[in-house]
Regions:
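Hydrophobic residues within well-ordered alpha-helices
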Residues: 53-54, 114, 164-165, 232
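Periplasmic-binding protein-like
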Residues: 7, 11-12, 81-98, 188-233, ...
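Short, Asp-centered acidic motifs that coordinate Mg2+ and/or phosphate
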Residues: 59-60, 79, 170-171
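Pocket-lining segment of extracytoplasmic ligand-binding domains
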Residues: 118-120, 124-224
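Bilobed "Venus flytrap"/periplasmic-binding protein-like clamshell domains
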Residues: 3, 7-31, 89-162, 177
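Short helix-initiation/N-cap motifs at beta->coil->alpha
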Residues: 40-54, 64, 84, 144-162, ...
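An extracytoplasmic/periplasmic, membrane-proximal ligand-sensing/linker region
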Residues: 9, 14-25, 209, 224-288
């Protein structure tokens, strides 16, 4: 792939514009480190990831863990490195979900209180912005798809938060770190937020309501040669928190790939892609 363009598909879970603000400098960083290739960031919506990978329109993919697990099973991609997030000087390689309502909402104080209420999340395929929270509800004996008055998806993390604070929805879900980020940017006040099912047991600095999972990976597609994959992995793991690419993305850098087995187990519990038929016995299985 020497001299060729290298396209990094990135899940744009906060919209295309924010995606480029966050990750554009990463392409610049790689262009400076690996001079015989030209790297580009390609923002992709939740509904665009599979097609882009299947068609080979991208060479690497930076996606949430549940999408990665599906891509690994369906298209033989392989994890290369894992993101290190950063908060208050602490480096993190895990994240989770937050279930919240407005601090002025006196009728919702527990997960049980959300029954027969309206709820908004980011996207059906958002791991931190819906799937982790969905599993948490199931663990508490609550089926959101049957017991909520309304369940909608806002499309981005930021819009999800605004729709709850405006009173359009009774409660919502977002990935960890988003509330703190919006507060730091002066867009919301944390005092206006009430966290539901708040977890304090594990050593994790963000507000969270769910189990904690390994962070986003960068995956290489099967057509990418070993030499380029090795160069990209080494360059990314050399990234420091002070580098423009890290600062723009609000991360500490990158580390060796983590174990994503727990993600697969969660998807099996939810019975969603690529495990939508998990546990079911087909006629083919019986014949075999």
């Amino acid at each position: 792939m020497s001299g060729q363009e290298v396209r990094i598909g990135v899940l744009a879970n906060q919209g295309d514009e924010n995606c480029m603000k966050l990750w554009g400098a990463t392409a610049k960083y790689l262009n400076e480190k690996i001079k015989d290739h030209k790297f580009f960031i390609v923002p992709l919506g939740f509904d665009e990831i599979n097609q882009s990978v299947e068609s080979g329109d991208v060479d690497f993919a930076l996606v949430n863990p549940s999408i990665y697990v599906e891509l690994e099973m369906k298209y033989d991609v392989s994890r290369l490195i894992t993101l290190k997030s950063q908060v208050s000087g602490k480096e993190l390689i895990r994240f989770g979900g937050v279930i919240f309502t407005s601090s002025t909402n006196t009728t919702i104080n527990t997960l049980e209180d959300i029954k027969n209420k309206s709820f908004v999340a980011v996207d059906a395929e958002s791991f931190g912005g819906w799937q982790t929270e969905w599993k948490e509800f199931l663990d508490h004996g609550i089926d959101p798809y049957k017991e909520f008055a309304k369940l909608d998806f806002a499309g981005t993390q930021e819009q999800t938060v605004y729709k709850v604070l405006s009173g359009e929805y009774d409660a919502g879900a977002t990935r960890t770190g988003i509330l703190e980020q919006l507060a730091q940017e002066g867009k919301i006040k944390l005092s206006d937020i009430k966290i539901l099912n708040q977890c304090t047991s594990c050593n994790f600095p963000f507000l969270h309501s769910t189990q904690i999972y390994p962070e986003w990976p960068i995956a290489r597609l099967s057509h990418v040669d070993d030499r380029l994959a090795h160069e990209v992995a080494l360059a990314m793991m050399e990234m420091k928190p002070v580098d423009e690419a890290a600062k723009n993305a609000n991360i500490a850098g990158w580390t060796v790939p983590q174990n994503y087995t727990v993600i697969g187990n969660t998807l099996k519990t939810l019975k969603i892609r690529p495990f939508e038929n998990y546990g079911e016995i087909s006629i083919k299985d019986i014949i075999i």
